[in-house]
């Protein structure tokens, strides 16, 4: 009798390559898939396959992104690589590809360049928690002292943006040599070393189900004799019958109790991350809950009106504005399930923001929204998306 295939279920981690144009991000991505496939199975992808990144849409924005996957000794990785700088900016701000860690590719021949800095800043702003560095093109540098200088420069740059520069793993190698099958330290060995660094330096991400319960409110119904039912998709955590719940955002926070969980018209004892459920709330009136609020574990999330954000403004070609905007611009900010009007303050010295720009701004909303750092939103004018953003820091 034939043995069935043994499938080991490895923990899953999301990563991606970032860094300056032409420093070798796509070549490195190809090298990783090629070399790890030989060792752990999977599918190798060539440079051309990765480079012809398909278009996808996130929050009304078109982004070109390549997705590859590979396995290491301990894990399964999903890895994103983008063809152009603008795609990285859009990807990181919309959270289209959430990264548990990033591989920063820096050419040893050139050292850190403007986009190196910009991608590190973006990673900090959008909450990419870990960066590992691959110093590429080491075959083009004969001078060991030069390599050391570039390494010091990279560590300093990381520290400037609050990453632990001194403790960051920096792997020196040549993605091209590795792709060509070079067996030296800078060839295949460097890729395997990078894989080990991914496994050991990036901790296993918390699964959505293990976090504190939160569910954005999509709809509210009143069922005679039963009370108020709130429907939505559980974003994080678990809700059980009998749990205390807070209703947060738009109005003063209210405490209530979950007296029932329904899914597909069946009663359950709990709902968990990813489930579309109806939650029955004890003693809550229909008019006390509305779309745009969240149900959450008490004390786990607070409502805020003022925050700093990293935003990307759609270009005219992407269907965005045709003209720049200025300080005091008042669009709608679409958080989870609803729009809230807010005004934008620009950084000192910035007069206006052009379509196609990305920039750090401060936002003041007219009504509070339940938020944490890292929450994504769309910027809209009359229902049309004109930008995307991510909460960098909550102020009040």
UniProtKB/Swiss-Prot annotation:
Boundaries of every tr-type G domain copy: 10-206
Region of interest (G5), ranges: 174-176
Amino acids binding Mg(2+): 26
GO terms of molecular function: GTP binding; GTPase activity; guanosine tetraphosphate binding; translation elongation factor activity
Keywords linked to the UniProt accession: Cytoplasm, Elongation factor, GTP-binding, Hydrolase, Magnesium, Metal-binding, Nucleotide-binding, Protein biosynthesis
KW GTP-binding (keyword) present: yes
Name used for this protein in its record: Elongation factor Tu
Designated gene of the protein: tuf1
